């Protein structure tokens, strides 16, 4: 009904872990749309939860302080059909990690974008399509994620898929490896398995130093 409700995260408690999921949209990318078509939630009006450079990091930090074990920030951002993240995507994602997020997962571009490790935490800039169908063959290649939490360690399993008839289908091992190898130069920490899936492990308490990738 309003901005306060729109920015509330989903909280899931399972197997002794408290998982918090925030969902934001980069409103700067959609300025061409009128507020009637795509309204931002206001103090007393409904709409989507827009990323705010000041307030959103505060919300993430508060979740960490309130005992969240694993924080996911799901972003709707980026330029459609671009295979590389733009500067705003990188800025938002880094701010989210700095505020306490354990991973950032992106959507919107309809194609896959690179994976980055920032200060020991993964950023999946864009998963591509899922239950969606387009004629452009570049939009048929995508992936989804499975986060496996064991103590303070997390393994992100990356499953490449083909979109056919509005439905995702697991890729063959060779096609899966091909897709992951395209993403891998930006994230050499990711292991590509023989069956064509990816595995990226990290610690919830990581203090790794950051090295900027070249997308």
Where in this protein do the model-derived segments appear?
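Acidic, metal/ion-coordinating pockets
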Residues: 1-215
